[in-house]
Regions:
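FAD-binding subdomain of flavoenzyme oxidoreductases
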Residues: 1-131
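Glycine-/charge-enriched secondary-structure boundary and capping motifs
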Residues: 129-141
Length: 141
């Protein structure tokens, strides 16, 4: 959807190799979940096959359709309740600009406190990722 100016906000970490069906089954998400939520927050509706073979349609054209949240129960159930065959998703417009910031901290606690302070001031970053020394060394190897 990028050529049309839209994107799928949950941004699963495995986005290069995953499928929407897998995202729905696992309730996947990545670094953007802090601001935009997980897959369950972007699934408007599904067509699914129940274990007995019945075809069901859950959800509707808007998020938070009235009634029991069977859709919410299905998303993330890892295929134990049904197999999703179609999904209607909420897409977001791509932002006009993106700013990336890299900051170093003396400890994980200090980094966590900085993130808390930023969010406490009403700024919710689109994504936050943290790597400790061991992870950085592994990534650089």
């Amino acid at each position: 959807m990028a050529p049309f100016g839209f994107y799928y906000a949950p941004d699963p970490s495995s986005q290069q190799v995953c499928s929407i069906g897998g995202n729905v089954a696992e309730n996947s998400g990545g670094a953007h979940c802090l601001k935009y939520g997980f897959t369950v927050h972007h699934v408007l509706g599904v067509e699914a096959v129940l274990p007995n073979g019945d075809l069901v349609h859950l959800g509707g054209p808007v998020l938070d359709a009235p009634g029991l949240d069977l859709l919410g129960a299905l998303v993330g159930s890892e295929g134990t309740l049904a197999v999703v065959t179609k999904a209607t998703l909420r897409l977001l417009r791509r932002p006009e600009s993106v700013l990336t910031l890299l900051a170093g901290f003396d400890s994980i606690d200090a980094a966590g406190e900085a993130v808390s302070a930023i969010i406490g001031r009403g700024i919710v970053p689109a994504a936050v990722e943290m790597m400790d020394r061991l992870t950085i060394e592994a990534a650089e190897a």
